[in-house]
């Protein structure tokens, strides 16, 4: 009887720990195979057959369709370069250049992965429509109120996620350092 109770207790503890670890990995995001460059994080293996089981479960849970590894990579930013969460009531500037890519998109989502409604019905920019400086760099202001130049409205969302998708790019699994890949800076400028 004592052996049976010990086995039952061990099984219960193992189940709770396993389910708890899985829940944590799915809700908090895991860094298995992640590339982190400044405020940007990408998981280049999500579009491959060798994706880790936690990422596979997160993809199934979110219902997203990841970019195939031969097509490109998606970088996500939920905070600025200093680690402050992106707030839709604040002005945030993305400045600099992107890694080499045939085409890129920058899109604004809420924390549930839905596009944020706003008065302009603009949720992002592409590499074809962004206004650039003479040196090829750009500055995009993500803010609740209209700004001149490249303005991406937040629609008053409290928190949001920026997604930079690079198509036909050499950035991938072998990329490890920010000196290898120039990513736009994410800077919190002003908050009410």
Stretches found by the model and what they are:
Residues 1-192:
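A compositional/structural signature for long, glycine/proline-rich flexible linkers
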């Amino acid at each position: 009887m004592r052996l049976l109770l010990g086995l039952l207790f061990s099984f219960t503890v193992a189940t709770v720990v396993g389910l708890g670890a899985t829940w944590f990995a799915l809700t908090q995001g895991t860094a298995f195979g992640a590339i982190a460059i400044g405020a940007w994080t990408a998981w280049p293996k999500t579009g491959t057959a060798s994706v880790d089981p936690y990422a596979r479960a997160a993809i199934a849970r979110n219902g997203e369709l990841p970019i195939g590894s031969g097509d490109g990579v998606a970088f996500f930013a939920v905070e600025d370069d200093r680690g402050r969460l992106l707030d839709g009531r604040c002005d945030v500037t993305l400045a600099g250049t992107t890694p080499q890519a045939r085409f890129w998109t920058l899109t604004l989502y809420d924390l549930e992965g839905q596009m944020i409604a706003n008065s302009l019905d603009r949720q992002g920019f592409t590499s074809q429509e962004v206004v650039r400086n003479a040196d090829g760099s750009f500055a995009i202001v993500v803010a609740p109120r209209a700004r001149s130049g490249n303005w991406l409205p937040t629609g008053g969302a409290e928190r949001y996620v920026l997604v930079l998708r690079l198509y036909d790019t050499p950035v991938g699994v072998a990329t490890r350092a920010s000196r290898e890949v120039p990513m736009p800076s994410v800077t919190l400028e002003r908050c009410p």
